[in-house]
Curated annotation (Swiss-Prot):
[2Fe-2S] cluster binds at C105, C110, C113, C125. This is Succinate dehydrogenase [ubiquinone] iron-sulfur subunit, mitochondrial. Keywords: 2Fe-2S, 3Fe-4S, 4Fe-4S, Electron transport, Iron, Iron-sulfur, Membrane, Metal-binding, Mitochondrion, Mitochondrion inner membrane, Oxidoreductase, Transit peptide, Transport, Tricarboxylic acid cycle. The lineage of its organism: Eukaryota, Fungi, Dikarya, Basidiomycota, Pucciniomycotina. The keyword Oxidoreductase applies. It is a peripheral membrane protein. GO terms for biological process: respiratory electron transport chain; tricarboxylic acid cycle. Residues 186-216 form the 4Fe-4S ferredoxin-type domain. Its EC number is 1.3.5.1. One of its GO terms (cellular component) is mitochondrial inner membrane. [4Fe-4S] cluster binds at C196, C199, C202, C263. It comes from Uromyces fabae. GO terms for molecular function: 2 iron, 2 sulfur cluster binding; 3 iron, 4 sulfur cluster binding; 4 iron, 4 sulfur cluster binding; electron transfer activity; metal ion binding; succinate dehydrogenase (quinone) activity.
Length: 283
């Protein structure tokens, strides 16, 4: 779990590059084929909370003089889907159409709904609502990002960094006929990297990225850099390493491992970064 210290939590930057400080602020199922044990397991505990509060970060760029606040909404969980994104959609559709957030696939594939939920960077579509506690769900945008509105971070700089590593196959000697061939063993080397959906949960959980994101590429981009270095079809591995040979782009990683703990896809950016360091040290 990524706990954001009180001294850091209020410091979420707005899209105009000015720091913004937070003010204190039913589905039915058939049981005809179920065993008694299965039926008992499927019953909701009596302690389950039927109504849940969601405290959500709000900031409107059209009202620049108004400080960001936490706004609380109450949701009947019996009339809401199981995920935090379901609650956000319900709030927007039924309670407050001004609430702004990104979402698309609802299946953990696009990365659009990345946000900080109860102190952890994750995807709202994959985060289940905790029904066993009456504590409100606290939802913030990804930390230390410029905010466009409410839960929508400005991803411009993140994508610019991603573009800088040239995330595509580079080879000056294409095959005379057909496609590039790759052995199963070489293909397996890409597992755990190509699945990255660029949600930025890992990068925005990294203290080194918080303080050096103008120069340090961050876990997500560095893992993607290694994805292309490790690809047997790419012939620009040395060139890619050379571009990282400076004091900031790569070496600001201090192996804190927040990136690995928070990745909603279960990937290991820290491992990829360590591979880059090892290869560059042995070159």
């Amino acid at each position: 779990m990524i706990n954001i210290p009180n001294s850091i939590r209020p410091f979420i930057r707005s899209a105009n590059r000015t720091p913004c400080y937070l003010r204190s602020i039913s589905s039915s199922s058939s049981s005809s084929f179920a065993t008694p044990a299965e039926e008992h397991a499927g019953k909701q505990p009596s302690s389950a909370v039927p109504v849940k509060e969601f405290s959500i970060y709000r900031w409107n760029p059209d009202e620049p003089s108004k400080k960001p606040t936490l706004q609380t909404y109450s949701i009947d969980l019996k009339k809401c889907g199981p995920m935090v994104l379901d609650a956000l959609i319900k709030i927007k559709n039924e309670l407050d159409p001004t609430l702004t957030f990104r979402r698309s696939c609802r299946e953990g594939i696009c990365g659009s709904c990345a946000m900080n939920i109860d102190g952890v960077n994750t995807l709202a579509c994959l985060k289940r609502i905790n029904k066993e506690t009456s504590a409100p769900v606290k939802i913030y945008p990804l930390p230390h990002m410029y905010i466009i509105k409410d839960l929508v971070p400005d991803m411009t700089h993140f994508y610019k960094q991603y573009k800088s590593i040239e995330p595509f196959l580079k080879n000056d000697n294409p095959p005379a006929q057909g496609e590039f061939l790759q052995s199963p063993e070489d293909r397996k080397k890409l597992d755990g990297m190509y699945e990255c959906i660029l949600c930025a949960c890992c990068s925005t959980s990294c203290p080194s990225y918080w303080w050096n994101q103008d120069e340090y590429l961050g876990p997500a981009v560095l893992m993607q850099a290694y994805r292309w270095m490790a690809d047997s079809r790419d012939s620009y591995g040395e060139d890619r390493k050379e571009k990282l040979q400076n004091t900031l782009s790569l070496y600001r990683c201090h192996t804190i491992f927040n990136c690995t703990k928070t990745c909603p896809k279960g990937l290991n950016p820290a491992k990829a970064i360590s591979h880059i360091k090892r290869e560059m040290a042995s070159a």
